[in-house]
Amino acid sequence: MRPFRCLSGVTAAIIAALGCAALAAAASNLKLDFAKDTVGAEPTALVSVVGIWRIESEKGKNVLAVDGRQWKEGQSSVGIADKARALYGERYAEFLDRVQAYAYYPYVVAKDVPDFNNGEMTVRFEGISGRIDQGAGILFNLKPNGDYLTIRANCLENNLVLWKFEKGKRSSVKWVRDTPTPSRQWHDLKVRIAGAKVEGWLDGKLYLEHTLPEPVSGRVGLWSKADSHVYFDDFTVTPAD
């Protein structure tokens, strides 16, 4: 397993600033189909932290693409310095100074969901290409220090995994094999949260169940890995009643 070192300074800057921008403690409903976004641009409702994320057209419909075809270790998102400056003003430099230029796992963060702790998140995805990976995940429990969890599917491996990213290192929490996920087909991924209980669903089937040591609480987003070129659509975040 390869080591992971997060973009500690800028990532922490972005996450903390997002938290300051949203004072409400409860999670917000979110439904994104990217129809009003501009093809070729980054998504307006998601903050691109690591990797190349942009809107592409697929059969005349806007989708969100993570494009790892020119992936390199240490590839932060385009304009990361400007994003940090916009979020932190004159303080941005101190965060950029802490950046460790090594990022293996692309992800975006939902701007308008300050804290999610109960409910479900869904997204549709299609693996397009990738020789190393074709990973598509829902990121959750994202903390200001950059720690987070993700449940991800992989079109090359046909498995569903709950990963933990903590103190700059990745470790598997729960691993489920034999989850058919063909490339070039759309799939439905769902993560359901109830306190510390986590469920992972793929194409309408419950595959993964796990109880964490502590209840989930943090920001959410979408996740991928390495050279994956994957389409995402219809990302929803629905808090429990």
Set out the residue ranges of the language-model regions.
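Boundary at the C-terminal end of the N-terminal hydrophobic targeting segment
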Residues: 24-27
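Short tryptophan-centered beta-strand motifs in secreted/extracellular beta-sheet-rich domains
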Residues: 34, 121-123, 185-194, 198-200
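Short, aromatic/His-centered strand-loop micro-motif at the edge of beta-sheets
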Residues: 166-188
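Secretory/extracellular carbohydrate-interaction modules
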Residues: 71-161, 165
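Ligand-recognition surfaces built from glycine- and aromatic
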Residues: 217-241
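Extracellular glycan-recognition surfaces and repeat-rich motifs
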Residues: 41-91
